[in-house]
Amino acid sequence: HMSVGLLAHVDAGKTTLAESILYLTGSIRKPGRVDHQDAFLDTYDLERERGITIFSKQAEVKVGEKEVALLDTPGHVDFSAEMERTLQILDYAVLVISGADGVQGHVQTLWRLLTRYEIPVFLFINKMDQEGTDRQKLLEELQKRLDERCIAFEEEQEAFYENLAMSDEAVLEKYLSDGTVE
């Protein structure tokens, strides 16, 4: 069993991602939408009315044979204390970033908190279909403003392994010795 938290700056699409995960894992029959006020994890009237997550919520999902507690946290700065309480129990975090907005100040704050709590982080870049987004520029911004070890999951597996190996000394040694990172 593992605990995975979803964190984001406001309007990055975190709740929409949570709905998609719940739907694709078979936990819900139909994904809700923030603008339709029927998101599964936004259970309080005020959350539905304002279209924001105010309280952290948990949903249990099954991914393969693994049981996962998915924790949806508030993205609005006013509810940061609620989000931060959740960090103490996370095994992993997914930091959702709007590709259209780039690395916002609150994203940097979330990154520092996740680093302080030593929580491994997967970045999920959302809204890349919006006009003006540039994948390479965003990756460079992530590396400059968050961590130089941020890498993209490449479609080409070899390129991904090379980038991954460059982010950690032990992984690099393994990759150089036998061509794998596992």
Predicted regions and their residues:
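P-loop NTPase switch module centered on the Walker A-proximal segment
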Residues: 1-97, 103, 144-146, 150-152
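P-loop NTPase catalytic nucleotide-binding module
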Residues: 1-12, 99-182
